[in-house]
Structures are given as structure tokens and as C-alpha cells.
Amino acid sequence: MPDIRVEVVYALPERQYLRQLVLEEGSTLEQAIHASGLLALRQDIDLSVNKVGIFSRPAKLEDTLSDGDRVEIYRPLLIDPKELRRQRADRTRK
């Protein structure tokens, strides 16, 4: 089987993690994340909680990767975006 090149990224406010990998064609998001070593490096990543995506589009751990894909591990939201907009609007009105 030919190989594919992918990137796995995880971004924090103070630091970004970027791993470039060469995997077998047919590899999944989950396999790429495990191969990146980020799970061992960052104890706060929990694949049962953190959502994942490919190029900013939501994806499933079992989705198959293509050559050149960027796998993204998302941090949990601290506050609902609608609630945040509501709070900002309230502050502006005062």
C-alpha cells in the first residue's frame, strides 16, 4: 500500500502542537492521533470527550484519511458561543 502524509494538530492558547506523519493509506483519524504521540504528551486529551475534525470540518475517529489531510483535535468549549454573545450584548447595553 502507498503511504500518505498527514498532520495532527492540537492548539492551546499558549502553545500549538503539530506533528507531521507518514501513514499507510487507509489509516483512520484515531490511528493518526495515536501515532502522533500527543495522547501520551497531553493528558488533557480524551478522545471520548474531545471532538476531532479534518481541515475545520467535524469528523469521526473511524473516518479514513487522505494524503495531505490535517487532523485537528479540538478543546472542549468553556462557554456556549450563544451565551457568550448574549453576555457581550448585555455589557454593551449597560
UniProtKB/Swiss-Prot annotation:
The record's InterPro entries line, in alphabetical order, gives: Mopterin_synth/thiamin_S_b (IPR016155), RnfH (IPR005346), RnfH_sf (IPR037021)
The family database entries (SUPFAM superfamilies) matched by this protein are listed as: MoaD/ThiS (SSF54285)
Which Pfam families does its entry note?
Answer: Ub-RnfH
So what family is this one in?
Belongs to the UPF0125 (RnfH) family.
Q: What NCBIfam families does this protein's entry cite?
A: PRK01777.1
Please identify the protein, giving its name as recorded.
Protein RnfH
